[in-house]
């Protein structure tokens, strides 16, 4: 949930420690120190913990600088070397870095968007590593009962039923290409009615639970999906831009390393499914678990740390 994009906070000065930590056994070169940063909301903190802990478990000295503010504060900190690694979102970051789309524009394809993003990052001496399957973008959900009674698993499954269903979402949804307008143009879905609510917030959740709407727009990594047992419908015709999660790293750090940092961070992305991310978000946001504990448990479950 890129809610951090809309929150503003002052960024304190970050002291960069340049000295390398001790080498590993066997006479290999010393490992560079690493500073992992994040914007200011719980999903980012958990992702920052995942990156930090897998590096720490492999002998890296890591400084955590989380909750630094919105992207327009944190991205410059990454460029300038105040932090080295930042969890990011492909399509959103590409649109932020290349606002005019002169270098590349986000697409619905993860690989294409990654390629375009890398071209945009080259000037800032940054590298985007492998993206996870997990996303944080517009999603459409139904209750478990609705999904079960109508055998709904993907958005295209709504085709026989949409004419008798009510769609809920933000007031601008009917005219937005990634909301009702897109559902009509890409999926051929026309709903019986539309109920203006919020952007996947408590109004939408309550309307789904109260059967005031049949389909609701909720961000794909929102903790309510797990907490309320909603079914996130697969975007099988790729309506949404590819806002997959991926670590962005300073080239200067990668050049000091022997490839281990890249390999370790890519191993996190390879295991991070939508369901896994949503479960961690629910634990941290709803159950109020410590993101450090949640991240450690997930890394151990995936066999990435001992």
What are these regions (language model features)?
Residues 15-20:
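C-terminal motif of bacterial Sec signal peptides marking the signal peptidase cleavage site
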Residues 22-25:
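Bacterial signal peptide processing site
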Residues 33-68, 133-205, 289-293:
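Bilobed "Venus flytrap"/periplasmic-binding protein-like clamshell domains
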Residues 49, 53-54, 72-84, 99, ...:
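Short helices/loops that flank or line small-molecule/ion binding pockets
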Residues 70-71, 81-94, 112-113, 143, ...:
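Beta->alpha turn/N-cap motifs
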Residues 97-107, 114-129, 212, 224-238:
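Ligand-binding "clamshell"
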Residues 107-166, 251, 270-274:
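A conserved helix-loop-strand patch within extracytoplasmic ligand-binding domains
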Residues 125-126, 132-136, 198, 221-268:
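Periplasmic-binding protein-like
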């Amino acid at each position: 949930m890129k809610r951090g994009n809309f929150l503003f906070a002052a960024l304190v000065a970050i002291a960069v420690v340049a000295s390398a930590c001790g080498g590993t056994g066997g006479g290999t070169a010393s490992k560079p120190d690493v500073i992992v940063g994040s914007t200011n909301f719980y999903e980012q903190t958990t992702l920052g913990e995942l990156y930090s802990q897998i590096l720490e478990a492999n002998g890296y000295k890591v400084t955590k600088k989380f909750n630094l503010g919105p992207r327009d504060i944190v991205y410059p900190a990454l460029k300038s070397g105040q932090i080295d690694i930042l969890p990011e979102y492909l399509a959103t970051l590409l649109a932020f870095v290349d606002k005019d789309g002169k270098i590349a524009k986000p697409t619905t394809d993860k690989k294409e968007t990654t390629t375009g993003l890398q071209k945009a990052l080259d000037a800032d001496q940054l590298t985007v590593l492998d993206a996870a399957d997990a996303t944080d973008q517009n999603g459409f959900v139904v209750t478990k009962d609705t999904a079960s009674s109508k055998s709904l698993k993907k958005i295209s499954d709504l085709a026989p039923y949409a004419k008798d269903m009510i769609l809920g979402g933000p007031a601008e949804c009917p005219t937005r290409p990634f909301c009702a307008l897109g559902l009509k143009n890409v999926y051929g879905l026309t709903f019986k009615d539309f109920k203006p609510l919020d952007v996947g917030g408590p109004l939408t959740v309550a309307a789904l639970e109260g059967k005031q709407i049949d389909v609701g727009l909720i961000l794909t990594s929102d903790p309510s999906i797990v907490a309320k047992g909603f079914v996130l419908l697969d975007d099988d015709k790729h309506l949404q831009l590819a806002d997959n999660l991926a670590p962005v790293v300073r080239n200067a750090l990668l050049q000091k390393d022997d490839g281990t940092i890249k390999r370790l961070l890519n191993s996190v992305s390879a295991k991070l499914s939508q369901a896994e991310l949503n479960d961690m978000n629910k634990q941290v946001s709803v159950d109020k678990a410590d993101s450090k504990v949640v991240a450690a448990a997930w890394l151990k479950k995936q066999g990435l740390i001992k």
